[in-house]
Every structure is written in structure tokens, then in C-alpha cells.
Regions:
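Hydrophobic membrane-embedded segments
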Residues: 1-130, 134
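Interfacial helix-capping/hinge residues at the ends of transmembrane alpha-helices
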Residues: 22-25, 184, 218
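Juxtamembrane transmembrane-helix termini
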Residues: 29-30, 57, 131-145, 158-161, ...
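Hydrophobic transmembrane helical bundles of multi-pass organellar membrane proteins
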Residues: 34-39, 153-156, 168, 208
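Small-residue-rich loop/turn and linker elements
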Residues: 62-63, 161-163, 209
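Polar-ligand-bearing catalytic/cofactor-coordination segments
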Residues: 142-199, 223-227
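Post-HEXXH active-site segment of zinc metalloproteases
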Residues: 196-227
Length: 227
């Protein structure tokens, strides 16, 4: 389990470089179509899912394995971020954790801290999954009495703002007080979200956020994906 945790950490670190690159590209491509935005974040998603990475001198990812999987057993623990400046700051701190060479029976403190961090990570993942399940259940109950307007469009007195719910068969939910041109405009907007498969990408993005919840850049990436 500790090895899986370290792999997740490494994938998250590698994806962070891509997030920074996407943020820069978003500034350059402000007027690009919406699908370009989804494509850019899709590249980040692939890196968060796939443990394999291709490194090169031109790669945006300096190192695919910043933290060695056997670091907790290393006599002198070090990382390789691919950025010398970062290594020069972090590695001396890690080395200070190592027990003196003449003390052979002392455990590497990382053998203690990594399992603890692993447990904290699992608690975070479990908490977010539980929050998601409860929120989805409450939302389904909220629109349980919704009335069909037409096709996959429903209206409910319990809805205050429009939204799309469902992955396989997405439905558009609207408040009852919406009608006329406003209603048609909102429906067209929500249908555009469905055509772009936002009802797929956003749940996928949140699932990845659940796994990489400890990384602030992933929260920023998810917020920007949902815009």
C-alpha cells in the first residue's frame, strides 16, 4: 500500500508540471473554443491516470519518479525532481531524517511517516467519496418530484438554478419560475454542455481530484475545468 501511495504522489507531482503548462497556455489561448480547454485538461488527466511517462530533454515533466519507491528503506533518502534547485533544498532535509551510520538498529523516520501519510491520504479519499455519495443521493431526492417539460428537460420547485444530472442519460433540471426566452436560452446553454460531454469530464475530474486531493494544483485545475 505504501508503494501505491508513493506512485500516486509521483504521478501527482508529474501532473503538476502539466497543470502549470496548461495555465500558461490558457492565458495564450483565451479566445480558443471550449473544446480546447477540455483537451488541455484531458492531457493532465491522462498523466494522473497513467503511471508511465516519456522523459526527454524537451519534456514538460522533468522526472516521472521524483520520489523513489524504496525511499523509506534508503540509508540516505533523496529525491530526483529533475530540477537541481529543488533537489538542493529538499535532499539535505531528507538526509537529516536518516539515523547516524553507526546506529544500525534505528529505523528511518520515513518508515514511520510514510505509512502515517498513507493513512491520512486514504481518510481524505474516503471522506470525499462519502461526501460525493451523500450529495448525489440528496440531489436525486431533491429532484424526485420534478415534472417533465419536454424530452430530457425537467422542472422542479426544489431547483434554484439550472444544472445537468446523470452520466449515461443526462437530464436538464430547471426551476419552475423560468419560462419564455429565458428558458429557451438556458436550455440551449445546458444542451451545449451535454454536447461537449461535460457531464462525463466533470465527474472524471472530480474522481481524479478525490485521488489527488492533497495537491492544491489539482483543486485549481478542477475549478478551471468546471468553468
Amino acid at each position: 500500500m505504501n508503494e501505491l501511495f508513493l506512485k500516486i504522489i509521483n504521478m501527482s507531482i508529474s501532473a503538476s508540471w502539466l497543470v502549470v503548462a496548461v495555465l500558461i497556455l490558457r492565458l495564450v489561448l483565451k479566445k480558443a473554443p471550449k473544446w480546447v480547454n477540455v483537451l488541455l485538461w484531458g492531457i493532465v488527466a491522462v498523466r494522473l491516470i497513467c503511471p508511465l511517462s516519456f522523459e526527454s530533454a524537451l519534456s514538460l515533466i522533468p522526472s516521472s519518479e521524483t520520489i523513489p519507491l524504496d525511499i523509506e528503506m534508503a540509508v540516505k533518502p533523496t529525491i530526483d525532481s529533475g530540477v537541481p534547485a529543488i533537489n538542493s533544498v529538499v535532499n539535505p532535509v531528507l538526509s537529516s531524517f536518516a539515523p547516524p551510520q553507526h546506529v544500525l538498529t534505528s529505523a528511518n523516520p520515513l518508515q514511520i511517516w510514510i505509512p502515517i501519510l498513507n493513512i491520512i491520504w486514504l481518510i481524505g479519499v474516503g471522506s470525499l467519496l462519502l461526501y460525493t455519495a451523500v450529495s448525489y443521493w440528496r440531489l436525486c431526492r431533491k429532484v424526485d418530484t420534478a415534472v417533465r417539460y419536454k424530452d430530457n428537460i425537467f422542472q422542479s420547485e426544489n431547483v434554484s438554478s439550472p444544472f445537468v444530472l446523470g452520466i449515461i442519460r443526462p437530464r436538464i433540471y430547471l426551476p419552475f419560475n423560468m419560462n419564455g426566452q429565458d428558458l429557451e436560452h438556458v436550455v440551449a446553454h445546458e444542451q451545449a454542455h451535454i454536447r461537449r460531454k461535460d457531464h462525463w469530464w466533470k465527474p472524471l475530474g472530480f474522481f481524479l481530484l478525490t485521488i489527488h486531493w492533497f495537491n492544491p494544483l489539482m483543486w485549481l485545475a478542477y475549478v478551471l475545468l468546471c468553468r
